[in-house]
């Protein structure tokens, strides 16, 4: 399989629905074939997110220290069991560990079949639903205790070095959640805007907050591989099995190689996934590519650099321990002798026993979580029920961002998706189990003009097991808008909403 340039994965490409049909056509006709969905087919034959019903109980001291968390999740997997048992697990696995002071926790789940669309993987993968429930419960706890939601989180969050019993007992090796919390508080002007302000003409503005964590690949399961070689002109070719689905991972992986090899990014050519020639990669899913495949690339580049030094030392008549890799050349320690990369590459192709190529496969025994805090400022028209997010502040700890620009647009896109889940995107079924929202006229996805200012900052930690300290970012960014927007609407209307999306009709009734 030679992967073409595709975009917009978000989990949909993990599940085979109609792909078998063009395969049969090709098999029978011996000719290429493709299947192109209409919008109706895309809306009715693809895999939506799992519908979940959650029950949360919290035990806390009077000063807001959360001592116990009890979460039950009932998940609707639809007509088939695609991803059913795994997504439901993440609803607890990626929410409970945020609260590091809890002395007791329980997570119980059930998955049921229904006569609905078969649910599948979607960005956030169950954590999104669980975080909406747990974070909303914490916001409600703060309200009942008369404590600022920001303050109650300050008192309870997990910190770097803490053991996380609800996260496989893993040590929190890198964490800037405390700094993310403070940054969002300061950037949105929380103290001046919390909880609500009357803007006149029946409109109010309120703020709400939420936190999130995710994973960086699947522990001891995901595999990333890289092959790297130097060409006769001194440039590099990097072959990877990971699929760039619009995330920019080809660029990021090339950056990692270029950093190790101390060369311009343009000197690294990336060859994408081709199952006949690319090294094995288990797939671009579960926020794993930068953390898992990126580490393989880093190790691969280090191995190649050592081989280049060996050949360069031979050309200079020196011991390999007496030379220095200088990016475009190998030099003696005093700099008086020099062999260029082109000379070294040419030498390796004639009478050499050292192949200037390296292949590395990597898998991680841990999955260090990225963290995020988000705060929404929502303007609500109490008469019409219209709610608009006019400002969203976010702070993300994804370790050390390899490419801050790509990380930022990942975050902005995830926030926009989360706001859509909170306010407009809904799926309902008729008596036959057919979805009613079968076009974009009925299924409202927010456009950029529907949302106000989105501002993302990064609070860097350093994850020693990742490439140059990096963790994942792909999924965590969708998780905070749901509880943040819901809490802001509560402050505006004084009514809690426990189902999503929160529609204009519901808000208008609450405002009466």
List the model feature ranges, each with a label.
Residues 48-52, 219-220, 368-372:
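Short loop/turn motifs at secondary-structure junctions and domain boundaries
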Residues 3-19, 45, 79-84, 201-211, ...:
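FAD-binding core of FAD-dependent oxidoreductases
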Residues 71-80, 243-245, 392-399, 460:
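Short, solvent-exposed aromatic-acidic interface loops
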Residues 32, 39-105:
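Active-site cavity-forming subdomains of large catalytic enzyme subunits
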Residues 27-35, 62, 87-214, 256-512:
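C-terminal catalytic domains of large/alpha subunits in multi-subunit enzymes
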């Amino acid at each position: 399989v030679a992967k073409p340039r595709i975009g917009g994965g978000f989990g949909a490409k993990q599940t085979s629905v109609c792909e078998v049909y063009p395969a049969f056509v090709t098999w029978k006709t011996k000719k290429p074939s493709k299947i192109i969905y209409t919008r109706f087919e895309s809306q009715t034959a693809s895999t939506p997110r799992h519908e979940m019903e959650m029950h949360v109980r919290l035990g806390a001291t009077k000063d807001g220290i959360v001592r116990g968390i009890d979460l039950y999740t009932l998940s609707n997997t639809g007509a088939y069991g695609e991803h059913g048992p795994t997504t439901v697990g993440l609803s607890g696995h990626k929410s409970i560990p945020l609260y590091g002071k809890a002395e007791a926790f329980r997570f119980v789940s059930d998955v049921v079949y229904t006569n609905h669309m078969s649910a599948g993987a979607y960005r956030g993968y169950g954590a999104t639903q669980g975080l909406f429930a747990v974070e909303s419960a914490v916001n409600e706890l703060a309200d009942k205790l008369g404590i600022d939601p920001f303050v109650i989180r300050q008192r309870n969050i997990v910190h770097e070095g803490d053991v996380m019993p609800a996260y496989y007992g893993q040590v929190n090796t890198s964490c800037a959640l405390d700094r993310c919390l403070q940054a969002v508080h300061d950037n949105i002007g929380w103290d001046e805007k919390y909880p609500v302000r009357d803007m006149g003409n029946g409109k109010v503005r309120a703020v709400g907050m939420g936190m999130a964590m995710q994973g960086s690949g699947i522990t001891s399961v995901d595999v990333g591989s890289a092959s790297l070689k130097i060409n006769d002109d001194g440039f590099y070719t990097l072959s990877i099995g990971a699929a760039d689905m619009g995330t920019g991972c080809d660029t990021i992986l090339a950056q990692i190689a270029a950093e190790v090899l101390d060369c311009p990014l343009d000197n690294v050519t990336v060859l994408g996934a081709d199952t006949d020639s690319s090294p094995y990669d288990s797939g671009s899913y579960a926020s794993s590519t930068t953390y898992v495949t990126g580490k393989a690339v880093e190790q691969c580049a280090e191995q190649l650099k050592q081989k280049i030094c060996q050949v360069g030392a031979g050309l200079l008549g020196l011991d390999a321990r007496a030379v220095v890799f200088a990016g475009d050349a190998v030099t003696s320690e005093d700099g008086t002798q020099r062999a260029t990369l082109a000379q070294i590459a040419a030498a390796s192709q004639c009478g050499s026993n050292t192949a200037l190529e390296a292949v590395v496969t990597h898998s991680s025994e841990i999955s260090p979580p990225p963290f995020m805090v988000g705060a929404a400022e929502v303007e609500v028209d109490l008469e019409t029920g219209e709610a608009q997010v006019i400002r969203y502040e976010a702070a993300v700890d994804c370790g050390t961002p390899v490419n801050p620009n790509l990380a930022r647009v990942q975050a902005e896109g995830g926030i926009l998706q989360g706001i859509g889940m909170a306010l407009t995107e809904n799926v309902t079924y008729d008596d036959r189990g057919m979805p009613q929202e079968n076009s974009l006229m009925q299924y409202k996805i927010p456009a950029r003009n529907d949302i106000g200012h989105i501002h993302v900052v990064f609070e860097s930690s350093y994850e020693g097991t990742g490439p140059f300290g990096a963790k994942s970012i792909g999924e965590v960014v969708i998780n905070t808008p749901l509880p943040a927007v819901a809490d802001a609407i509560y402050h505006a209307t004084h009514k809690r909403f426990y189902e999503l999306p929160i529609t204009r009709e519901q808000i208008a009734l609450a405002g009466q």
